[in-house]
Regions:
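Bacterial N-terminal signal peptides that target proteins for export
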Residues: 1-11
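Glycine-centered signal
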Residues: 1-2, 18-22
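Short, intrinsically disordered low-complexity segments
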Residues: 4-5, 16, 91, 96
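Bacterial N-terminal signal peptides
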Residues: 10-18
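Intrinsically disordered, low-complexity segments enriched in small/polar residues
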Residues: 21-34, 38-73, 80-137
């Protein structure tokens, strides 16, 4: 009986560890709009080794602060951001091009290259879980 309890406990622990390793984390990004305009924000995030999620639009009015939760993203360093309030990458920024839906909310796991109502934009890699629109130096 003791042996069965030990085997059962080992199986339970193993199955718990396997399930925990398969669960995807979510990434929280705190956005603050320091500009004088309403700003629409989109994200391009790695959700596993070969898949990317492109999602938008999150609209922030001037002075607004708030979190965005990217479901399935595992690491903030695998997240790129785009916004329509004068995002100009610097020489030290890592950039990535992706397609966003024009003027409509979207969540895409497949590239939408040259599809109707989509345009290609340049995203910038996030360096931290907090991002301020405007006053970029």
């Amino acid at each position: 009986m003791y042996l069965f309890k030990k085997i059962g406990a080992a199986l339970l622990l193993t199955s718990t560890l396997v399930l925990a390793s398969q669960v995807q984390a979510d990434v929280r990004i705190d956005i603050k709009n320091d500009s004088s305009e309403d700003c629409s924000v989109a994200f391009n995030a790695r959700v596993d080794k070969t898949k990317w999620l492109t999602e938008g639009w999150y609209v922030f009015v001037p002075g607004e602060e708030g979190p965005v939760i990217l479901k399935g993203a595992n690491d903030v360093h695998d997240v790129f951001i785009y916004h329509d309030c004068g995002l100009t990458p610097t020489d030290r920024d890592e950039v990535k091009r992706a397609w966003v839906k024009v003027n409509l909310k979207f969540s895409d796991y497949l590239p939408k290259e040259n599809e109707k109502d989509y345009q290609e934009v340049q995203f910038v890699r996030l360096n931290s879980p907090a991002y301020t629109i405007g006053n970029r130096k």
